[in-house]
Amino acid sequence: PLSNSPKAKIKKQLFQPLTIIEVSIDVRHNASLHKITDARIAQPFTSIPFNPYKLSISIFIADFLNQALMREQADKPLFAYIQNSIEWLDNCDEGFANFHLVFMMRLSMFLGFYPNTDNYHAGSCFDLRSACFSGVVPMHNDYLKPAEASIVSLILRMSFANMHLFRLSRTERNRLIDIILHYYRLHLPSFGEMKSLEI
C-alpha cells in the first residue's frame, strides 16, 4: 500500500499524466537498464489534477503521445511545444474544450505531415494520405467529403489563443478525434489503438 507520508505523496505526483519531471540516472554502459537515482517534478501543476475535464484531456493526450512518439528521437523543439502546451492548459481558466484537437494537429508539424492548406476552397475534399485539400476526389477511400473537410480547415485556423471563438458540438468534436487519429495512423504505421476513454 502507498504511504501517506510527504515523500510518498511526491512520488504519486510523479505519475500524474503529462507531469514534467527531472531525473538523475546512473548510466552504466554495460547495462541494458539504467537506474534512476533521483526524480522530481520540474513544474508542479496548479489545476490539471484538480479539474476533471482537464484531467480527462491530459489522460487522452498522454495516451496519444505514447502512440505518436513511440519511434521519435530526442527533439528539443518538439519537447518545447509539448511542454508549452501542457503549461498553457494548466494555466488557462476557460475556453479549452478544443485543446486536444489543436494540440494534435499542431503536433503533426513536428512529425512532418501537417496538412497543406494552400489549395483549400469551399467544396474541397481533404486527402488524408497526401495531407492536402483538392477539388478532385482522390482514387482511394482515405479522404473527407467537403462538409468534413471544411471542419478540418477550421481546426487548422485555430490556435490556443483563439480556439474559444470556434464553437463545435460534442458530436463534431468526437468525429474530429476519429478523423485525426485515422490521419495519424495513415502517416505513422506504428500508431496503435488508444487505450484512454473518449473525451
Where on the chain are the PLM-derived regions?
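Non-catalytic alpha-helical scaffolds and adjoining flexible linkers that form interface surfaces
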Residues: 1-199
